[in-house]
């Protein structure tokens, strides 16, 4: 009778294994990992004495602390049965090219329920074995070598507890079947010592593991998912726990979330499908992805709103925000920050909650935190649940993105009426990527009116071109964008768009402020002024009455009727102030601006209606948020001190006032007094750029303060590109009001 060689990796559990082997007739011979050579082992095998090998548990890492174990495994595969326990499993996985890393949990002397495939060493063993664990490392499913298959996992968290070689009689378990707290340990050892030779099949057919080339016996499946837990199942279990915990917190309870939605506390929606279809080029679904199960950390410190603005300004149609915290390091707060960051864009991207959505509560969460759509993964949902979640999402105004991985899942997606279907080239059960998946699913669509998207593995223009030729409308790109050194250039190159270029502006517009009569107005209009400002601040020297302002308004409207506008479609990639300045520049002119300072909102609204103002200028300490309630574009004044300090609010904040006016003003405020501030400060502020543009898009401003016909050209030159309008009042006045020659000279100096 031959013996079982038990390699001891200096672990006390070796003696338990020895006892189990002996009790089931395994005739164990134990030797420590540094007290025997591979040559000696080969000799035992040649002499017909060695029938099987067990690699024991042990401390440390398999590469540094397992002695001869790895060499023994490499030699013995295909010759005789091998069983690895704990460190033994790690040796096998590491030797074959897999990754051994942190398991996501530390278990020392703890038990877990283990579910298994009921074949091999698990033949005839009951399910959900209570099993003792002593480890913090484990095999990583995303890097598991293709020659190995998962045989068992923990029921609670999906950590790999067992692997098997697909061809050779090599088995391994991560837990300790030899422990007195583990169930089925001796049954497992009894199965192992019955195995013969080095390959499956033949005399090993009794245990159910198919020989190479044979088909595995079918197992019960749901929606194509294997009965054994995979990374997808593990995430599924964790997300259920996450949601359960969130629902228990009073502030995020289902009732509170529902109430918030009923109060319209959520941001307004845009139509996800329409946003995709209306994109004039291939729609990019740009993903914010800090990490993933398959790649680990990608960009763990990335700012979600910053990344979102890069994507939006480069032309992304959708921003996909991963909100799963454990494997992808995302959060709902990321999504809300992204939604707020892009809110001021003229044609903002749709926001997708990319997560493993399992309940109506998660859809409510998505809506409350700013999503326009959610991802529904067919592989994670039973057909009835898929239908219920799809219908519920649509009832909230959110057409879901339904993810499929094969024609069978496509059929389920079509049955529920999906209008936007994404094909994941990555199988979520094993995280392998097959770039032909999208093509196969597209062929199965048979020309149906569905927006088809490719969802993974896309990193080049060639990848995109291939799918576009097959009818794909949108592509989701995550890792490649997150790793790109120039995000905007890379995104545009993916879909064949030229690099973004800042279009040089024409000469600035001219605003003549302090118009006090129709004569002043005629003079300014005749000289070619674009905007006329009337002061409506009681107690100031240039303040005019409402009746005079109405007369000036009528004159301005008459002159405007004879001018032409420049039709302008806001660029999909233009930020707030650039868009607003372009829109104002394209309008028929002249335009009438009413100037107010520290007056009530009701007074301002009354004046807009009574006078017929085209714009409002807030020249005092009014809240910027008032711009939301004023029915015409708002110019907000910000004071620049001699030291370059800006006062008056958040001058770069988008989404409120349509224009920024920089005027002189010291610590106490001031401004509007014909005093200049150093123009290099204006240049610095302009070059700080629109929010999210990283300085590549100058901040458009109206330049005011101490301008005259003699210095305005120098001011524009020193302040640089970004001055889209210049504002003058006292610089073109004489004792009796506006001076024709000065006004004409000023306009000429600006226009060149």
UniProtKB/Swiss-Prot annotation:
Keyword annotations for this protein?
Answer: Amino-acid biosynthesis, Aromatic amino acid biosynthesis, Decarboxylase, Glutamine amidotransferase, Isomerase, Lyase, Multifunctional enzyme, Tryptophan biosynthesis
Q: What is this protein called?
A: Multifunctional tryptophan biosynthesis protein
Where is each Glutamine amidotransferase type-1 domain found?
Answer: 3-202
Region annotation (Indole-3-glycerol phosphate synthase) maps to 231-495
Briefly state the protein's biological role: Trifunctional enzyme bearing the Gln amidotransferase (GATase) domain of anthranilate synthase, indole-glycerolphosphate synthase, and phosphoribosylanthranilate isomerase activities.
The metabolic or biological pathway listed in the UniProt record of this protein is:
Amino-acid biosynthesis; L-tryptophan biosynthesis; L-tryptophan from chorismate: step 1/5; Amino-acid biosynthesis; L-tryptophan biosynthesis; L-tryptophan from chorismate: step 3/5; Amino-acid biosynthesis; L-tryptophan biosynthesis; L-tryptophan from chorismate: step 4/5
Q: Where are the transmembrane segments?
A: none
- Gene name tied to this protein: TRP1
Entry annotated with the keyword Lipid biosynthesis = no
Quote the catalytic residue positions: 86 (nucleophile), 176 (for gatase activity), 178 (for gatase activity)
Q: Which GO terms describe its biological process?
A: L-tryptophan biosynthetic process
- CDD domains, sorted: GATase1_Anthranilate_Synthase (cd01743), IGPS (cd00331), PRAI (cd00405)
Is Zinc-finger a UniProt keyword of this protein?
Answer: no
Q: Where does L-glutamine bind?
A: 58-60, 136-137
